[in-house]
């Protein structure tokens, strides 16, 4: 028994998720570089400070552009991967639907002026992306059981639980940080936001680990 379409699909999905991870790292670095540029010293060495500030902003812009390119490339890779894999398992068809719905929500949120509505649309986009991930894992687990690879299936169950848990924690932290503004609460808000990013990073690592093992499993049987 072989699943050539799923093998191609998972390989592309795995590559896409690595690109997304690199993209998020670029975004974080852009934020750090931007903050450093803003904090550049002033009066005593104005010329040097101005150069440092300008260089920092240029660096931040380059990193943001890299983030955008990586995310677009990752979406295309994911889209192709889902389309490939759906021919071997129905769960990937559902995952594809949520992937498209998520990008639609993201696209609309960019053009919405109302901050509240934009936040809701972004949250719906994040939820769609999470559901897409869940169905990818479910599809791989089903294939793993058909191949008698209970180890992969069990790992998938563990990753599913972790993803759901981290999403709940991330949502709560993001929700709390949204309503904390000004003074001391600004510091608390920043800490909570960083904690949310850390939780999301852990989720990505676990998901990548699962995809890596799944990719190897499918390559062996080809």
Per-range role (PLM):
Residues 23-71, 105-129, 167-203:
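Membrane-helix interface segments in multi-pass membrane proteins
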Residues 1-32, 70-110, 124-173, 199-222:
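Membrane-interface extramembranous regions at the lipid-water interface
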């Amino acid at each position: 028994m072989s699943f050539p379409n799923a093998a191609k699909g998972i390989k592309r999905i795995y590559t896409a998720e690595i690109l997304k991870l690199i993209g998020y790292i670029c975004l974080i670095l852009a934020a750090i570089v931007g903050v450093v540029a803003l904090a550049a010293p002033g009066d005593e060495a104005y010329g040097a400070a101005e150069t440092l500030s300008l260089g920092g902003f240029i660096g931040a812009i380059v990193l943001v552009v890299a983030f955008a390119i990586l995310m677009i490339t990752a979406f295309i890779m994911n889209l192709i991967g889902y389309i490939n894999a759906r021919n071997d398992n129905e769960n990937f068809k559902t995952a594809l639907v949520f992937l498209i719905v998520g990008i639609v929500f993201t696209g609309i949120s960019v053009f919405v002026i109302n901050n509240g509505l934009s936040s809701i649309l972004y949250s719906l986009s994040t939820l769609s992306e999470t559901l897409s991930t869940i169905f990818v894992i479910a599809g791989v687990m089903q294939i793993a059981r058909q191949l008698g690879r209970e180890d992969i299936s069990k790992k998938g169950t563990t990753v599913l639980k972790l993803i759901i848990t981290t999403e709940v924690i991330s949502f709560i932290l993001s929700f709390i940080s949204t309503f904390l503004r000004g003074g001391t609460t600004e510091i608390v808000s920043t800490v909570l936001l960083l904690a949310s990013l850390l939780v999301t990073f852990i989720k990505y690592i676990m998901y990548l680990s699962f995809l890596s093992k799944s990719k190897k499993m499918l390559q062996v049987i080809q």
